[in-house]
UniProtKB/Swiss-Prot annotation:
Entry keyword Metal-binding: no
Assigned EC number: 5.6.1.7
Family under the similarity heading: Belongs to the chaperonin (HSP60) family.
Catalytic activity: ATP + H2O + a folded polypeptide = ADP + phosphate + an unfolded polypeptide
GO cellular component: cytoplasm
One function term, GO molecular function aspect: ATP binding
Listed InterPro entries: Cpn60/GroEL (IPR001844), Cpn60/GroEL/TCP-1 (IPR002423), GROEL-like_equatorial_sf (IPR027413), TCP-1-like_intermed_sf (IPR027410)
Function: Together with its co-chaperonin GroES, plays an essential role in assisting protein folding. The GroEL-GroES system forms a nano-cage that allows encapsulation of the non-native substrate proteins and provides a physical environment optimized to promote and accelerate protein folding.
Organism: Mycolicibacterium chitae (Mycobacterium chitae)
Short name of any one Pfam family annotated for the protein: Cpn60_TCP1
Entry keyword Transcription regulation: no
Entry protein name: Chaperonin GroEL
Length: 120
């Protein structure tokens, strides 16, 4: 029963990561699997599940604070192109995203749809 709960949790983590960030689902899935595996191992060894939960929550808070402290604003078209290029794994796509963002502005919306038409 715990394994099924763990699998559902990992699935939910991947879905939520995709919904919120649109990227990082693999990293989130690997982290969630490790948390479930190690959590179950610790509970089986006699650890208090609520204590584990509190420890995980504190760790998440600390990591989140540190990530926010080290985060850098992406402001220029060149920075946007570089960041998007890294995320897409393709500098040409990064340049296209930067160009689109330049046209719609910081509060604009860019919709990307898959096409079955070659070259479009």
């Amino acid at each position: 029963p715990y394994e099924k709960i763990g699998a559902e949790l990992v699935k939910e983590v991947a879905k939520k990561t995709d919904d919120v960030a649109g990227d990082g689902t693999t990293t989130a899935t690997v982290l969630a699997q490790a948390l479930v595996r190690e959590g179950l191992r610790n509970v089986a060894a006699g650890a208090n599940p609520l204590g584990l939960k509190r420890g995980i929550e504190k760790a998440v808070e600390t990591v989140s604070e540190n990530l926010l402290k080290s985060a850098k604003e992406v402001e220029t078209k060149e920075q946007i192109a570089a960041t998007a290029g890294i995320s897409a794994g393709d500098t040409t796509i990064g340049d296209l995203i930067a160009e689109a963002m330049d046209k719609v502005g910081n509060e604009g919306v860019i919709t990307v749809e898959e096409s079955n038409t070659f070259g479009l």
